[in-house]
C-alpha cells in the first residue's frame, strides 16, 4: 500500500476518492501487503487515521495471512517457531498453527523480532530438520523516508547462509499470494472473477506477480518506480498511471479512460513507442530519440 495509497503518514492525492469509488460502486477489492507485522485490524485503524474510512479487516490480505493459509492448506498439522511480530503470530494462531519453541516443523520468518537468541534457536531448528519459510522476499521495509529496517528476506537470507538450507518465499511476487487474493475477491463477488486488476508501484513484486498470475498489471508512478526504469524489464505493465486517482472516474462510470493506455509512458505522461533499436517520445508531433534501455535477463 505504501507508494500506492499513502507515503509515510500522508495519503497520495486522490487515494481517498479512489477507495470511496470502490466502496460506493460495490467493486470487490483487496489491499495486498508484503508487510507481515500489522494485523488487518491495525491497517483499518491506520488508514482511518490517514483519512480513509469504510474499510474492514476483510479488505486486507497480508503476507502473514498468506503464510498462515499456505501452511494450513499444505501442512495443517505443522508447528512453527516464529521470528516476527503481532500480525504474523495472530495469523498463525487464527489458522491453528501452534507456536513451538522445542521441536517445530517450520521456522517462519517475518518482519521484526530477529534477536540474536531467536536467530540462534532458528539455526538449530533448521539444522535439526525444520523447514525455513519466509513471509516475503523483501530485504528491507520502510520505517520513514529516511529510515529502513531489515525485512523478512534479509532474515531468511541470514539463516540460509548459516545453515546452507534454502528458504521458501511467500508474499509478492509468489503466485500463491495472487491466487489466494483472486479466490478471496471471487468469494466477495459471489462468483468467479474472469478479470482482476493488480495496481502496484513495484515492478519486481506487484507487476511481475500479477502478470505471472494472469492478472492485468497496472503500474503507478506514485511510489518506488521511476518511468525511466520500466523499459529495463522483460515483462511490462498493462497500463501505467500517475496514481490511483487516474482510475477513479473509470470505476464510477465503468468506462475505460483514454488517458495513459499504451504499454509505456514517459514520466510526463507522453506516449513512448518502440522503434527498432531505439525508443522515441511523441510530444505534440515532435519526436525526440531516446536511447534504448538495457534489458534485464
Question: What are the functions of these language-model segments?
Answer:
Residues 1:
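Residue immediately C-terminal to the conserved phosphorylatable aspartate in receiver
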